[in-house]
UniProtKB/Swiss-Prot annotation:
Keywords of the record: GTP-binding, Hydrolase, Membrane, Mitochondrion, Mitochondrion inner membrane, Nucleotide-binding, Protein biosynthesis, Transit peptide
InterPro entries recorded: EF-4 (IPR006297), EFG_III/V (IPR035647), EFG_V-like (IPR000640), EFTu-like_2 (IPR004161), G_TR_CS (IPR031157), LepA_C_sf (IPR038363), LepA_CTD (IPR013842), LepA_IV (IPR035654)
Reaction catalysis annotation: GTP + H2O = GDP + phosphate + H(+)
Record function comment: Promotes mitochondrial protein synthesis. May act as a fidelity factor of the translation reaction, by catalyzing a one-codon backward translocation of tRNAs on improperly translocated ribosomes. Binds to mitochondrial ribosomes in a GTP-dependent manner.
Highest taxon of the lineage: Eukaryota
One Gene Ontology biological process: translation
Annotated Gene Ontology cellular component terms: mitochondrial inner membrane; mitochondrial matrix
Annotated segments matching region Disordered: 32-51
Topological category with respect to the lipid bilayer: Peripheral membrane protein
Protein name according to UniProt: Translation factor GUF1, mitochondrial
Length: 674
């Protein structure tokens, strides 16, 4: 027998949802002003992880979670990532998916996957992260285990991107409805496409006034050859239509292929250093099971480790009894040296690796941008050395060695994957450790080919062959990159001129149907690291986007340019440039450096030299002291005698005098805004 209150609620539900049930014109009585309208019943939302932990307790929560995951077959696993340009809403969309699956509470924390402060402030991803989600399909009631692998989007971190994609079966291709397809989206699309990932196009930010959904869909079709009917228009900010994404992931992205009964094989996706537990590895378990106490063997270093803990990120580290094939999870291997964690390495179980081949695609990341780093105050060297060593623990791709400069004292030679990587490292050093650092002008790895066939890579201008060694050199080579730029049509001419002035070679010009142009240029890496992106943004009023990839080495006519003050080379300001721009660069250097030197009692010559030949010069006139101010106007002989004595004194001072250049002068000169 139905209770009266149940019948009443059913009627209210039917009346309030008359459009859904086909009663479009069903009349309803207007409520009187004295009556308050009934509040709509909100649909039940999944209980968040924090609520479950509080209600069940930590141990019971973990036990129930393990039991639930153990019942999910690998056919119900889905591993995916999000491909997006900077500021297209990747982190916001990730938060909405986590809220939808109950991993976090709505509005509890933004940008869950961006762990570093610099990631939150810049809106970029530097370290690959993952989070696991549990989703129950309403129609069948089946549980699904979803692994969202958050990847860096910038080319500087391409090694992490490719390893992350290798652990996924598909990706969400995120496009901003107001901006359309951008360069970074194009570059990462082709990388994902080359790795056979199933792509689901998502049109984001449809709530904006400038949103143009048909144009964005057309771009997706023309640029990526994807069916616009498959596009899901959403607003990650408001959550509109986000609930349609997970069913699409389950339907379109294939489950990972693996067998937990086979011997263990795990791919290292990324790693970081935790001050309490040491190295934490993010791995994709391809085959087998992995649990605490397992002895791991690295395929590339041949070193062994005892596993201290395994688990999933839910959203933070949640220990599990074991992890198995198909999962993307974390492992604490008891590794003491973080530099042994090689991204792309394969791990086996010790004693069960015979006949097993490492997973393909491993490559050691090669630094492409090198800078000299020095403390702004020499006394801070030991403190800053500890800070840099600690930061390098979390970033194994940084090349580090100590060096000494005659001008700036003791410091370090740092190698980075790119200019953004260097900028992020410097920012983290300053904000996390309060360090004040001077970075020299960036240089790239040049190749010297000798006449006897030997080759040598140099990353420091001091290693450039001197005049005595020139006869042994056959030729020099410098690295090039293939750039991809997207920009509005009206700026095409300006950007082409910019590329030409930076020794660029045009490869392709494609006019898109949406008022945008896609340009491909081969540009020397040395030109790219000299704030090429800043100049590109400046000449397009911020509307251009840029991405690039390695294009190998090419023969080049490069020279070493020295900046000398009174004949003494300043090693901190020595650089390698192309011969065609050496004179212009030399003139720029001497003119700029003159601004930061103080007047002396003797004349100071600032020169730019190439092969001991002066190509540019600026002079700081001597500071004049009036030695005749106390003389009578008629005493001409005494007047001339004092001036001659002053002249001789200045001549002698110039011969033996030395100019002291403070660190503040070098720091001001090396700042990008100068």
């Amino acid at each position: 027998m139905l209770r009266p209150w149940f019948c009443f609620r059913s009627c209210v539900s039917l009346l309030s949802n008359r459009r859904q049930y086909g009663f479009r014109y069903l009349a309803t009585a207007e409520p009187s002003k004295s009556e308050k309208p009934a509040k709509p019943v909100k649909p039940a939302k999944p209980m968040s992880v924090q609520e479950k932990k509080m209600r069940l307790g930590q141990d019971q929560f973990r036990k129930e979670l393990e039991e639930r995951i153990s019942k999910i077959p690998i056919q119900n696993y889905r591993n995916f990532s999000i491909v997006a340009h900077v500021d297209h809403g990747k982190s916001t969309l990730s938060d909405r998916l986590l809220e939808l699956t109950g991993v976090i509470e709505p509005g509890s924390k933004s940008q869950v996957l961006d762990k570093l402060d610099v990631e939150r402030e810049r809106g970029i991803t530097v370290k690959a992260q993952t989070v696991s989600m549990l989703y129950t399909e309403p129609a069948s009631g089946q549980d699904y285990l979803l692994h969202l692998v958050d990847t860096p989007g910038h080319v500087d971190f391409r090694a992490e991107v490719s390893r992350s994609y290798a652990s996924c079966g598909g990706a969400l291709l995120l496009v901003d409805a107001s901006q359309g397809v951008q360069a970074q989206t194009v570059a990462n699309f082709f990388l994902a496409y080359s790795m056979d990932l199933k792509l689901i196009p998502i049109i984001n930010k449809i709530d904006l006034d400038l949103a143009n959904i048909p144009r964005a869909m057309e771009q997706v079709e023309t640029t990526f050859e994807l069916d616009p009917a498959d596009c899901i228009p959403v607003s990650a900010k408001t959550g509109l239509n986000v609930e349609k994404i997970i069913p699409s992931i389950i339907k379109n992205i294939p489950a990972p292929v693996g067998d937990e009964s086979r011997p263990l094989k795990a791919l290292l996706v990324d790693s970081w250093h935790d001050p309490y537990v040491g190295v934490v590895m993010l791995v994709h378990v391809v085959d087998g099971k992995l649990k605490k106490g397992t002895k791991l063997l690295s395929a590339h270093t041949n070193k062994t480790y005892d596993v201290k803990e395994v688990g999933i990120m839910y959203p933070d580290r949640t220990p599990m009894e074991y992890i198995k094939a198909g999962q993307v999870a974390y492992v604490i291997p008891g590794m003491k040296n973080p530099r042994e964690a090689l991204v792309g390495d394969t791990f086996f179980q010790l004693g069960k690796s015979e006949g097993l081949d490492p997973l393909p695609g491993f490559e050691e990341p090669q630094p492409m941008v090198f800078v000299g780093a020095f403390p702004s105050e020499g006394k801070d060297f030991s403190i800053m050395d500890d800070s840099i060593q600690n930061l390098v623990l979390n970033d194994r791709s940084v090349h580090l060695e100590k060096e000494t400069s005659n001008a700036l004292g003791s410091g370090w030679r740092l190698g980075f994957l790119g200019s953004l990587h260097a900028s992020v490292f410097k920012e983290r050093l300053e904000k996390e450790y309060g360090a004040k650092i001077i970075l020299t002008a960036p240089t790239v790895p040049y190749k010297i080919v000798f006449k006897n066939g030997d080759e040598k890579i140099i990353t420091n201008p001091d290693e450039f062959p001197d005049n005595k060694m020139h006869n042994l050199v056959s030729h020099y080579m410098e690295p090039y990159v293939e750039t991809i730029m997207t920009l509005p049509n009206e700026y095409v001419g300006t950007v082409m001129q910019l590329c030409l002035s930076n020794r660029g070679e045009q490869k392709e010009v494609e006019y898109l149907n949406t008022g945008q142009t896609l340009l491909r240029y081969d540009i020397p890496m040395a030109q790219l690291v000299e704030d090429f992106f800043g100049k590109l943004k400046g000449c397009t009023k911020g509307y251009a986007s840029l991405d690039y990839e390695d294009a190998g080495y090419r023969k080049s006519d490069i020279v070493k340019m020295e900046l000398c003050v009174n004949g003494e080379p300043q090693d901190a300001l020595t650089t390698i440039v192309h011969k065609s721009i050496a004179q212009a660069k030399g003139k720029e250097y001497v003119t700029r450096f003159k601004k930061f030197l103080r007047y002396q009692l003797f004349e100071v010559a600032i020169q730019a030299r190439v092969n001991n030949k002066v190509i540019a010069r600026e002079t700081i006139k001597a500071k004049r002291k009036d030695v005749t101010q106390k003389l009578h106007a008629a005493d001409i002989s005494r007047y001339k005698k004092l001036l001659e004595r002053q002249k001789e004194g200045k001549k002698q001072m110039k011969a033996v005098g030395r100019i002291n250049i403070g660190n503040d002068a070098y720091q001001a000169f090396l700042r990008r805004d100068n």
